[in-house]
Amino acid sequence: MGKIIGIDLGTTNSCVAVMEGNEPVVIANSEGKRTTPSVVAFLNEGQGERKVGDAAKRQAIINPQNTISSIKRFMGKRYSDIAEESKLVPYQLEKGNNDTVRVRIGDRTYTPQEISAMILQKMKTTAEDYLGTTVKEAVITVPAYFNDAERQATKEAGQIAGLEVKRIINEPTAAALAYGLDKKNQDMKIAVFDLGGGTFDISILELGDGVFEVKSTNGDVHLGGDNFDQKLIDWLAEEFKKEESVDLRKDPTALQRLKEAAEKAKIELSGSSTTEVNLPYITAIDGVPKHLVKKITRAQFEQLVDGLVRRTLEPCKKAMQDAGLTVADIDEVILVGGSTRIPKIQEEVEKFFNKKPSKGVNPDEVVAVGAAIQGGVLTGEVKDVLLLDVIPLSFGIETLGGVYTKLIEANTTIPTKKSEVFSTAADSQSSVEIHVLQGERAMARDNRTIGKFHLDGIPPAPRGIPQIEVTFDIDANGILNVSAKDKGTGKEQKIRIEASSGLTDEEIKKMKQEAEANAEADKQEREKVDKLNTADATIFQAQKQLQELGDKIPADTKKSAEDAIEELKKAHEAKDIAAIDTAMSKVNAALQQLYAAAQQAGQAEGQAAQEPSQSTGNAQAEATDAEYEEVK
């Protein structure tokens, strides 16, 4: 069995790890960094090259509307759900079929799954470069509070990227697995506080005898580092607006500069009590350039984000209640996600749990490490570890009067299966609609629809007589399968809730083919750039050699070398790869002739220099002899 890599597909950054022997290893990308920005950029309105990771992030200021970041916020979401979130990004979002979200780039649109697949492809390539072999399987992490549609969308992104997703696991659970692997024989209860770029999760786990059991989970999929940045962006923009009467948020380039400056200031304020935002030439008013220069203290920043910090505490209380524990029962608190570096967050966590959080894990890497360990469990490399995860939200169906009837409660350990018998609501009813929902509200309309299907062919009977058995089956990824069976006729209808993310199997297959084609195109683009760079270096070297050897070689050899170099220059300017290959061969052949001619010229000079010295030597010998004879 090949390696199963572990991928933390984050809102802001992504990370990949793999088991090597008994140890998980975080793999550095081609730029030598252990995390990769979850950013995809399209050049020339989508007609040019595509960049992923650091290269995409670096060009964001000059290309904000075609640079996609924080795509995780839109995974599995309906367009009607994203009104607020769409304001946080500079790129254009559109409504697709079935109220799905689409990203507009030039003359085409992409699904969030396709954009995420591009990031996953980058992580896959990073792992393949390190391992020296093709990677086909992965464990991918998701926020614990992701619903069915969001989990399914993540799985689809993996498929589009050419990965068989062996398991979807919750980020806090992965972090606990990484933290507790060397403590698996200890009995302990841990809280994982996970505040990332776009989501917040809190999970309570119990460890003992190699079993990692999630007792409860809670969270907020609309709360993360992006929101903290946004508070700073709004403050800076409002301060500038007071002084200059211009709203910088209406200019995509200025907004992107503000966004990057806010993120940088937030990070700096974790280590110092004050920082300065300095953005020269942020805009021009009546042709006069304007600069934004603002000092901000940590106290001011904490005041701005106080509401966000407090929003993390309610899920913590709920998770503790659901686990049936008090803070005194918690042995260790683990901080996960870059946003937990904010001192105010650390203070509030310490205050809530009445203990200092553990500093024993790297918050940026621990989730990928846990995913790699789970990959090792699946391949058999990691033994004596059992992971028992839970579903974050209840599953159920709509029943008479628009009531939401739960079949499987939140925080139920997965995999799990539950059946319940329902009946018809009217006499002679021959068909029933099964409306599958996820959520915690009492009425169906207030919960999230994740699928609908019909069971037809029910024999006519008075209401309440037919026996319809509805079965919910949740797999280890937290993804739901539903079936409905008429117990009288044995007729059954099944549905795998996959359409909840808005993509059919056929669409996924097509996107996978496109992704593979793009991967090939990207590879060819890289090869083209490499070839152009090699040609450029060859031209430089050849000209240098020609200059150095010019006087020592015959005119015809020199002329053929100059012609070959000129041909390569033209091919390089035209970016004609076939012509470059031909011209490179000619230049290399000409260089060989140059070296050979220079060598011959050198040998000829050497012989010429040697002959006079020999005759001089003879003359001296003769003179010496004569003189000697004369004295004698």
Curated annotation (Swiss-Prot):
Protein origin, superkingdom: Bacteria
Induction info: By stress conditions e.g. heat shock.
Protein purpose: Acts as a chaperone.
InterPro entries for this protein: ATPase_NBD, Chaperone_DnaK, Heat_shock_70_CS, HSP70_C_sf, HSP70_peptide-bd_sf, Hsp_70_fam
Amino acid composition bias (Low complexity), ranges on this chain: 597-611
Species this protein is from: Amoebophilus asiaticus (strain 5a2)
Biased composition annotated in UniProt, kind: Polar residues: 612-621
Annotated coiled-coil segments of the chain: none
GO MF annotation: an example: unfolded protein binding
Keyword list, A-Z: ATP-binding, Chaperone, Nucleotide-binding, Phosphoprotein, Stress response
Similarity field: Belongs to the heat shock protein 70 family.
Pfam short name (any one): HSP70
Alphabetical list of PROSITE patterns matching this protein: HSP70_1, HSP70_2, HSP70_3
Phosphothreonine modified-residue sites: T199
Protein known as: Chaperone protein DnaK
Ranges for region Disordered: 597-632
